[in-house]
Amino acid sequence: MKKMFSFILLIQLLMMAACSDQNLIPKDKASKVVDTYGITAFTVTIGTKEETEALKASFIEKKERSEAEFSNNKQGVNLHGEKALKKITEAFEKLSPDPEAEETELIKKTAEAFEFKDYQMIRLEVTFKGYDSKEIMFSK
């Protein structure tokens, strides 16, 4: 019985940690990203020969809560919230996102913006304000 209680307590703690607010960003900062780049949701995963998820970055702007997450295993960087948003917007500066861009152009620019020239795979999901979501998968 004691073991069962300990197990349930451990599961609850893990669930609470997973549901933390560490990825949250202030509404004004999320709105600024949408106003500047026109992006309401962005998720990219870049894989290399060495690692299938060498880079993961995501930004999502919603009325009730906006979030950002950034992980670059090549550089040993794992950021959440405003720090992650800063890294992502630095990449957006280089990317110059365009909702009318061709898929191959988006892939190429995304790899360059996140400084991954040696990628094997890129999975990109992006939603521009007023446009349908684009989901692109590219493997070499």
Residue ranges with predicted function:
Residues 1-24:
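Sec-dependent N-terminal signal peptides of Gram-positive bacterial secreted proteins and lipoproteins
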Residues 52-119:
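Mature extracytoplasmic domains of secretory-pathway proteins
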Residues 47-49, 60, 127-131, 139:
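Solvent-exposed coil/turn segments that connect beta secondary-structure elements
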Residues 112-136:
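Short, exposed beta-strand-loop hairpins at the edges of beta-sheets
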Residues 6-7, 29-40, 111-118:
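Short, surface-exposed loop and linker segments with low hydrophobicity and enrichment for Pro/Ser/Thr
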Residues 21-66:
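N-terminal export/targeting and maturation segments
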Residues 17-31, 73-82:
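Short N-terminal secondary-structure initiator segments
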Residues 31, 81-87, 137-140:
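Hydrophobic transmembrane alpha-helix bundles
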